[in-house]
Design a protein with these regions (language model features):
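Periplasmic-binding protein-like
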Residues: 4-11, 70, 93-144
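A conserved helix-loop-strand patch within extracytoplasmic ligand-binding domains
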Residues: 1-43
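C-terminal functional modules
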Residues: 140, 144-177
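Ligand-binding cleft/hinge of the Venus flytrap
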Residues: 28-64, 167-170
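Solvent-exposed loop/turn segments at secondary-structure junctions
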Residues: 17-20, 42-46, 92-96, 126-127
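Second-shell loop/turn segments in exported
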Residues: 11-13, 35-42, 60-63, 122-124, ...
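Extracytoplasmic/secreted proteins, especially bacterial periplasmic and envelope-associated proteins
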Residues: 21, 25, 45-52, 71, ...
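Ligand-binding pocket segment of bilobal, Venus flytrap-like solute-binding proteins
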Residues: 46-108
Length: 177
């Protein structure tokens, strides 16, 4: 069917109020960040890439902290509540971008690569079996904000997935009609 989302990205993420804009600036500001990059599970691909970024950008004074996603996000919330500087491993799409005012640090050495895409695909004959769904998936294009808001709804939901999807669809009619 084609691209549904064209802003998929991984990298290092900071709150918007942090005044640096590039991974190049981390070393000079390591005291502000307590010399830590807060990450997720040790075996995750983003953690391996962050180890490469630490080497590529000469961030020898930094420690990459392993934790769970939920612990990383709790650390982010705690730091942001206090207005402290924090750098985490991050990716889009993710609901954290709907909940927190965040930005990716520029990666001039492209250690984390370029933007990626999410595509809708289906089995042969799907379009004939469900032409409405095929048209929907062929036409829908989501932004980070739209996809993050849907992911937040799924995370926070106290209802089943179908109800969440219907509610989100009704609130985003311009995307699905």
């Amino acid at each position: 069917f084609g691209e549904v989302y064209g802003e998929a990205r991984v990298g290092l993420v900071v709150p918007q109020y942090v005044t640096i804009h590039s991974i190049n600036e981390l070393e000079a500001n390591k005291d502000r960040f307590s010399s830590e990059i807060v990450g997720i599970d040790a075996g995750a691909g983003i953690m391996k890439t962050t180890d490469k970024a630490i080497a590529a950008y000469g961030l020898d004074g930094y420690t990459l902290m392993t934790s769970s996603s939920s612990t990383m996000l709790a650390s982010l919330k705690k730091a942001m509540d206090k207005g402290e500087w924090i750098v985490i491993t991050g990716w889009t799409p993710h609901w954290m971008f709907d909940q927190f005012d965040l930005k990716f640090l520029d990666d001039p050495k492209k250690v984390y690569g370029d933007l990626e895409e999410i595509h809708a695909i289906a089995w042969k004959g799907f379009s004939e079996k469900d032409p409405f769904a095929a048209e929907f998936f062929g036409n829908i294009k989501l932004t980070t904000e739209e996809l993050s808001s849907f992911m937040t709804a799924m995370k926070d939901a106290r209802m089943d997935e179908e109800e969440i999807a219907r509610k989100w669809r009704d609130e985003h009619r311009q995307l699905v009609d």
